[in-house]
Amino acid sequence: CCKQSCTTCMPCCW
């Protein structure tokens, strides 16, 4: 779970 620029647990940094 990456929450850098996302509000929910999304693969935004994966």
Curated annotation (Swiss-Prot):
Subcellular location: Secreted
GO-annotated molecular function: toxin activity
Disulfide bridge partners, by residue number: 1-13, 2-9, 6-12
Tissue: Expressed by the venom duct.
Keywords carried by this UniProt record: Disulfide bond, Neurotoxin, Secreted, Toxin
Residues passing through the membrane, by range: none
UniProt entry tagged with the keyword Secreted: yes
Coiled-coil annotated residue ranges, if any: none
GO cellular component: extracellular region
Keyword RNA-binding: no
Recorded family membership: Belongs to the conotoxin M superfamily.
Free-text note on domains in this protein's UniProt record: The cysteine framework is III (CC-C-C-CC).
Record protein name field: Conotoxin BtIIIA
